[in-house]
């Protein structure tokens, strides 16, 4: 398995669209497998989690439930493979859109960001990684829930959402004057409103 390999998952359901990206940590041998399992866990949770897009659902509880499910999947895989759970460490980010309800939730953990472009053309941050992460947060360590970013939004507010990878100082150079610069930049995915 290549270290640090990216996994992108796009899943259309009857009432929702899931778009996520994850990548294994550079020093983890099974990070790509962990990234795939993590995106599956997030997709399954948000699909089954009826009402997570509503204002009545507490985001801190959603974070805890989500992290618990991710850890469970990684732990089961580690047992199956005879490995340590930390070998499956990864960073992830993405968005789930419920077009019929005009709602979305974006999520991230570790490096990366989710940005939104309004109908007026302004690009603003929805979720950001910390500006200078000294040591990336670990899914399998105590306190990880505080590093999981979740944010709700109204889908019609945005013309386009962007999922970017890497540390903030890397991708911040690519966003200027309300546009994503061409060339070498960390843009992974762009989701346009229809």
Regions found by a protein language model. Name each.
Residues 1-194:
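PP2C/PPM-type serine/threonine phosphatase catalytic domain
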């Amino acid at each position: 398995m290549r270290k640090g390999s990216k996994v992108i998952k796009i899943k259309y359901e009857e009432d929702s669209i899931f778009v996520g990206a994850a990548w294994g940590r550079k020093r983890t041998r099974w990070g790509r497998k962990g990234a795939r399992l993590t995106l599956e866990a997030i997709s399954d949770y948000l699909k089954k989690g009826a009402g997570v897009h509503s204002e009545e659902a507490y985001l801190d509880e959603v974070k805890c439930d989500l992290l618990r499910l991710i850890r469970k999947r990684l732990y089961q895989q580690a047992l199956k493979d005879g490995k340590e759970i930390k070998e499956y460490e990864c960073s992830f980010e993405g968005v789930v859109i419920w077009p019929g309800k005009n709602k979305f939730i974006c999520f991230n953990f570790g490096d990366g960001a989710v940005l939104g472009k309004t109908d007026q053309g302004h690009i603003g941050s929805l979720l950001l990684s910390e500006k200078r992460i000294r040591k990336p947060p670990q899914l399998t360590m105590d306190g990880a829930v505080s590093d999981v970013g979740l944010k709700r939004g109204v889908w019609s507010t945005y013309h386009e959402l962007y999922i970017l990878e890497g540390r903030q100082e890397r991708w911040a150079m690519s966003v200027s004057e309300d546009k994503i610069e061409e060339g070498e930049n960390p843009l992974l995915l762009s989701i346009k409103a229809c």
